[in-house]
Amino acid sequence: MIWLEENMIKITFCFFKVIFILLLIVFSSAMLSIVERRLLAVFQNRYGPNRVGWMGSLQLCADMIKILFKEDWIPPFSRKFIFVLSPVIAFTSLLCVIPIIPFTSHFVIIDLNIGILFFLMMASLSVYAILFAGWSSNNKYALLGAMRACVQTLSYEVFLGLSLMGVVAQSGSFKISDIVNSQKYIWNVFPQFFGFLTFLIAGLAVCHRHPFDQPESEQELADGYHIEYSGMKFGLFFIGEYISIITVSSLIVTLFFGGWLGPWIPSCIWFILKIIFFIFLFILIRAALPRPRYDQVLLFGWKFCLPLTLFNLFLTAFLILV
């Protein structure tokens, strides 16, 4: 009975920890949309949202009310079940990666032995949301956007996986906490700089962030694969994009920048500050870079990212052998 009570306490504590982290990430993703709009306004020397509340502080509430009260319309010509399922997959696929990321040495929900492989699996799953959304909408622009997203994601996931193999080889483990502990004396970004560079580029592509947002380019495809979505279904796609930004930023910090490791201040503060830096970098990239052509995006991946990733693997193998 004592054993059963101890297990029930552990399960209950883990359950509330999962709920707390997931709610925190969803709320942070919603807030990130307002932060991005304000920062883009600063970069472009214009006013951002500043009408609702003090300095636009209540703009998020206004946006949520607008989305909740919009008509939740399903096109009569769509494949309804898949049409409804797609935003749910987009919202949950990379959100499920958050529980395997250690926030501190003592605060991790699930410390998987195959944490890296689990992330790659969930990143691959996210492309199905876009494929299903474009196909089930029965709209030519949505289908073109879905086709672009599939080719782009499948191409850059090759580099996403290969860029992490150097980190895995150097730390000797697929377990994310072991990778963080292996950076006690030197961060992986120094011996694995080319791997970090490729992972950052591939992470932008997997998140479909600028300059890799061809699947939803407004000027060419009229918002691409979610052209037929409205209301909360569109909101799930919208929040899912920001969840993917937080997830990829957390993984960059964990795998290449020592995770929670840092001097003087508490480890959780270090982890959050590093994540904020890379989120700011994602927004700065959107503000600074133009959108290239679709064929240029694919050629850049195969002609630049693939050789760079292979060079990083050979260099890592050489350093390990020496």
Swiss-Prot record:
Enzyme class: translocase
Location(s), subcellular: Cell membrane
Keyword Membrane belongs to the record: yes
Main location, first listed in the record: membrane
Catalytic activities: a quinone + NADH + 5 H(+)(in) = a quinol + NAD(+) + 4 H(+)(out)
InterPro entries in the cross-refs: NADH_UbQ_OxRdtase_su1/FPO, NADH_UbQ_OxRdtase_su1_CS
PROSITE patterns in the cross-refs: COMPLEX1_ND1_1, COMPLEX1_ND1_2
Transmembrane segments: 15-35, 50-69, 81-101, 114-134, 149-169, 186-206, 237-257, 265-285, 302-322
One BP annotation, GO: aerobic respiration
Topology of the protein relative to the lipid bilayer: Multi-pass membrane protein
A Pfam family that the UniProt record links to this protein: NADHdh
EC number: 7.1.1.-
GO cellular component annotations of the record: plasma membrane
Molecular function per GO: NADH dehydrogenase activity; oxidoreductase activity, acting on NAD(P)H, quinone or similar compound as acceptor; quinone binding
Its job: NDH-1 shuttles electrons from NADH, via FMN and iron-sulfur (Fe-S) centers, to quinones in the respiratory chain. The immediate electron acceptor for the enzyme in this species is believed to be ubiquinone. Couples the redox reaction to proton translocation (for every two electrons transferred, four hydrogen ions are translocated across the cytoplasmic membrane), and thus conserves the redox energy in a proton gradient. This subunit may bind ubiquinone.
UniProt family annotation: Belongs to the complex I subunit 1 family.
Subunit structure: NDH-1 is composed of 13 different subunits. Subunits NuoA, H, J, K, L, M, N constitute the membrane sector of the complex.
Protein name: NADH-quinone oxidoreductase subunit H
Species of the source: Buchnera aphidicola subsp. Acyrthosiphon pisum (strain APS) (Acyrthosiphon pisum symbiotic bacterium)
